[in-house]
Amino acid sequence: EHFTQEEVFSLNERIIVAPVLHQHKKKINIFLPYCDEGWFDYFSFKFISTGGWVTLEVPINKIPIIVRGGTLIPKLKVVFHKPHLAPIEEIILFPSKINIAITQKNMPLIFDDGDTNDYQKNKNLILTPKIKIEKNKLFLIFNKIGNGKAQKEKIILKYPNNTKLILKNCSNYFIK
């Protein structure tokens, strides 16, 4: 049913966007695909559902964005004249309703100067995150490739207040 909705779209298997297309609408009904990890509000980290039909309040100043539990989203500060050099400012980690271990192989964090072929000399940095969630503990483990540096000294990690975050490998890059 999720794929038959005309006013809802998936950015990928982990993020759903439900724009409000009708004036004066205060609530929308959408179908979320079932997942054990659960679906969460992007802005508040509030748990929504593990799937099925849900009704969401839609304030005028917010587009509903729903994120699957256990998702890691890097946020960039875009430099318009050189977008490939946009430094990662923040990483958002979403909780999960179940104990899980996820390796987001499709989401490595790549740090490169963007101008040279130094990556061929291993002068870039690739961090592939693995997220492990147990009760209210979120383990963030990075597989590190290369000897390059991140564009910023520190990257902010954003996650729910009631969750304890444990970093393994590369913790010197992050501010909790």
Give names to the regions the model predicted:
Residues 1-160:
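Catalytic core of carbohydrate-active enzymes
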Residues 149, 164-176:
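A carboxyl-terminal module marker
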